[in-house]
């Protein structure tokens, strides 16, 4: 499996699939189409059936059952796109055999070093084969590692027909990084009763709780007057925007929260005297707290509108996804099976909430309960991203083991 995973993964990351939140197409970028078409050909080549890609770039395929038991159809998903925050153009993966535990020079010319001093978790990977960036791009382990692991697991099952399994569906989806992954996903066509996203981080991650998530767009209109004659006339929209931000609790920001704590995150602040636009994301695991956060932002906007004039402040809040725990709890055995699969392979499951969202957050509310399992990457979305190939092998093995357990547990 190891060489197959390296070969697949290093090939996939060289396709630039950054998604674009400004685009209205699906997929949002041409590169995702390029990878989707490549995967269609590979799925056919390894012997998968019912291989399709629809007009929105969703790739689906079937591994037919080889057992007489009536096993539930399960699915595995990974996403095609990489994060828009950091360049994914001309990714040049570096392979480090038998990592020695020291500094890794990513880019000598630019003095970019991946060091255990900055990233202590590197110590866990001594002796592993690592794949890193060259310091100028992200790597794309999020989530091309998941794609490579699903492909490798399917190929393994096709090559080993003695392993009994039910029907398995796989899907590779666009635009997860900009929150649109499941928007045009056809759950009925996919036809699985349960699924797993292979989109987690380090070895053993198993997640079935995600944030409740919303975005808030605030527009503040000021009044620009020549500063020499501005007394009593000028209204500076930037200052009102600062007033808005200062009324949010300073300690409820991403840099001050972890575990089950929620936050307000000011993602963008653009403006001048005449007009300022603020863009926030709101996150909380608890539904009541989530609703309270949205209400607080509306209350601040209303108070400032009263102070400066109703036509000066507008706020628009849109929900993005909800905590998938609500939909997975009633079918908790799918989490238990993933837990057992890891334990069977000597992996310690690390069950924790996702401080983010996956496609599974939305899919679970669309009728397809979908927890998330590890894919192996570290330091996603930036130049210090890396992955252990040894962990990738374990992820592919967990996929195979989950499929085996579903068959074994069906009478």
UniProtKB/Swiss-Prot annotation:
Binds 2 Zn(2+) ions per subunit. Its cofactor is Zn(2+). It is found in: Cytoplasm. GO terms for biological process: peptide catabolic process; proteolysis. GO terms for cellular component: cytosol. It catalyses: Release of the N-terminal residue from a tripeptide. It holds the Pfam family M20_dimer. Its EC number is 3.4.11.4. One of its GO terms (molecular function) is tripeptide aminopeptidase activity. It comes from the Bacteria. Keywords: Aminopeptidase, Cytoplasm, Hydrolase, Metal-binding, Metalloprotease, Protease, Zinc. Zn(2+) 1 binds at residues 79, 142, 199. The active site is at residues 81, 176. Zn(2+) 2 binds at residues 142, 177, 381. Cleaves the N-terminal amino acid of tripeptides. Belongs to the peptidase M20B family. This is Peptidase T.
């Amino acid at each position: 499996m190891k060489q197959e995973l390296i070969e697949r993964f290093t090939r996939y990351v060289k396709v630039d699939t950054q998604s674009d939140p400004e685009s209205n197409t699906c997929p949002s970028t041409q590169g995702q189409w390029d990878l989707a078409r490549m995967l269609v050909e590979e799925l056919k080549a390894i012997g998968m059936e019912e291989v399709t890609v629809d007009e929105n770039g969703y790739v689906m395929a079937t591994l037919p059952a080889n057992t007489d038991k009536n096993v539930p159809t399960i699915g595995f998903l990974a996403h095609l796109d990489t994060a828009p925050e950091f360049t994914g153009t001309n990714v040049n993966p570096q392979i480090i055999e038998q990592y020695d535990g020291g500094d890794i020079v990513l880019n000598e010319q630019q003095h970019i070093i991946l060091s255990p001093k900055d990233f202590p978790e590197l110590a866990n990977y001594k002796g592993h084969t690592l794949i890193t960036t060259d310091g100028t791009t992200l790597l794309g382990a999020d989530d091309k590692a998941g794609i490579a692991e699903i492909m490798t697991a399917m190929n393994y099952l096709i090559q080993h027909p003695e392993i009994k399994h039910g029907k398995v569906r796989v899907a590779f989806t666009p635009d997860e990084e900009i929150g649109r992954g499941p928007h045009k996903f056809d759950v009925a066509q996919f036809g699985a009763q349960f699924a797993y996203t292979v989109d987690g981080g380090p070895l053993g991650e198993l997640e079935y709780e995600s944030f409740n998530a919303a975005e808030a767009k605030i527009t503040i209109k000021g009044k620009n007057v020549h500063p020499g004659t501005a007394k009593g006339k000028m209204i500076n929209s930037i200052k009102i925007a600062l007033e808005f931000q200062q009324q949010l609790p300073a300690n409820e920001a991403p840099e001050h929260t972890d575990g089950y704590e929620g936050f307000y995150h000011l993602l963008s602040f653009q403006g001048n005297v005449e007009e300022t636009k603020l863009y926030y994301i709101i996150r909380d695991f608890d539904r009541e707290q989530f609703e309270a956060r949205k209400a607080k932002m509306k209350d601040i906007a209303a108070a400032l509108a009263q102070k400066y004039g109703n036509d000066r402040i507008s706020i628009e809040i849109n929900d993005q996804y909800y905590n998938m725990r609500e939909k997975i709890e009633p079918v908790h055995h799918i989490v238990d099976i993933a837990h057992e699969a890891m334990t069977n392979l000597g992996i310690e499951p690390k069950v924790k909430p996702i401080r983010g969202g996956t496609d599974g957050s939305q899919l679970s509310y669309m009728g397809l309960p979908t927890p998330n399992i590890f894919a192996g990457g570290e330091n996603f979305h930036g130049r210090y991203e890396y992955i252990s190939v040894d962990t990738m092998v374990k992820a592919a093995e967990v996929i195979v083991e989950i499929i085996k357990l579903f068959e074994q547990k069906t009478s």
